[in-house]
Amino acid sequence: MRRRRAEKRQIPPDPVFGDVLVAKLINRVMWDGKKTIAQKIVYGAFDIIREKTKKDPLEVFRQAVENVKPVLEVRPRRVGGATYQVPIEVQEPRRTSLALRWIVEAARAKKGRPMKEKLAEEIIAAYNNTGTAIKKKEDTHRMAEANRAFAHYRW
């Protein structure tokens, strides 16, 4: 166990939109510390979003993340030799990071096109409450609902 709680890092906002959420997305897309490539991918995806939806890409992205954020998740808890999947509420910082992770994973899972196109498509899908990231959220909620009987084991 830790001696004390790890302090949250302050992430500086991204240079183009001046938004912390976009900076977090860039960090999630980034591989091997190649931030400029990640920025090109994200900003390219935002350009595609602007073309396809004719709306502000930042608003579309924010709404997409809001739609993907999970409210509940299950955590394993051992009680007397049996492991139960206990539904718990997700804290706000974790909600955001899960949403971003699921959007990026869903985009990476698609094959055969440039990453910026896949990312733009996934963000637009999440904005419209469809797509793989939304499915992941619904599956998580379904698991929590199915294990509702064990909610009294929360800690």
Curated annotation (Swiss-Prot):
A Pfam family: Ribosomal_S7
Entry superkingdom: Bacteria
One GO term (biological process): translation
InterPro entries in alphabetical order: Ribosomal_uS7, Ribosomal_uS7_bac/org-type, Ribosomal_uS7_CS, Ribosomal_uS7_dom, Ribosomal_uS7_dom_sf
Alphabetized UniProt keyword annotations: Ribonucleoprotein, Ribosomal protein, RNA-binding, rRNA-binding, tRNA-binding
GO molecular function: mRNA binding; rRNA binding; structural constituent of ribosome; tRNA binding
Function: One of the primary rRNA binding proteins, it binds directly to 16S rRNA where it nucleates assembly of the head domain of the 30S subunit. Is located at the subunit interface close to the decoding center, probably blocks exit of the E-site tRNA.
NCBIfam families named among the record's database cross-references: rpsG_bact
PANTHER family: RIBOSOMAL PROTEIN S7 (PTHR11205)
Protein name, UniProt field: Small ribosomal subunit protein uS7
Naturally occurring in which organism (per UniProt): Thermotoga maritima (strain ATCC 43589 / DSM 3109 / JCM 10099 / NBRC 100826 / MSB8)
